[in-house]
């Protein structure tokens, strides 16, 4: 992880205290620690604090945790974003089998990431696929950490419904959502 932006963790916030108890004393070390947690859905998709307890996380919970940590530490340079991007094998290895089965070149997927001083930081991807992700963005919006649950899903579903009609996709929304879920499951294998 590039040392794009760093600060020492204080003992004044709950998230900082949890990290300090793990021996993590600054933001860059927190980024690396969270990046190394395995990908996996948490028991509550809206509760980003579960990543430490469950030792796994998604793009939403990992980045929401880091954004909340930065906010609790008074660091406004770190912002949480949700983007909708074209998910295909090149930028999301592991989804080609599902996309080929349904004869789709890509599926619009919602993805959370950070922007630190307007530079994208994504702890769920390696640097090579990060380049493809940026070039595949269709839409992005700054959100707050508590918006990773229902709001993110609503935003994603609204985008997909619009995409279905504008790109003349042959599937209905329910089928498309199932295809998307199959792609996500393929990432956990």
Model-found features: residue ranges?
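Residue-level "edge-of-site" marker
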Residues: 47, 83-84
């Amino acid at each position: 992880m590039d040392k794009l932006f760093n600060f020492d963790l204080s003992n004044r916030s709950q998230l900082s205290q949890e990290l300090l108890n793990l021996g993590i004393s600054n933001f860059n070390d927190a980024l690396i620690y969270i990046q190394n947690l395995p990908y996996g859905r948490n028991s509550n998709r809206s509760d980003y604090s579960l990543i430490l307890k469950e030792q796994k996380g998604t793009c939403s919970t990992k980045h929401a945790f880091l954004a909340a940590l930065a906010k609790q530490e008074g660091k406004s340079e770190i912002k949480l974003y949700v983007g909708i991007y074209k998910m295909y094998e090149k930028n999301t290895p592991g989804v080609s089998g599902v996309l080929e089965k349904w004869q789709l070149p890509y599926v619009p997927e919602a993805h959370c990431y950070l922007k630190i001083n307007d530079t994208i930081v994504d702890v769920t991807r390696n640097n090579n696929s990060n380049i493809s992700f940026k070039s595949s963005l269709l839409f992005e919006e700054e959100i707050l950490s508590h918006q990773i649950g229902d709001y993110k899903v609503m935003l994603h579903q609204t985008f997909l419904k619009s995409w279905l009609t504008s790109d003349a996709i042959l599937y209905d929304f329910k089928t498309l959502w199932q295809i998307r879920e199959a792609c996500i499951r393929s990432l956990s294998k």
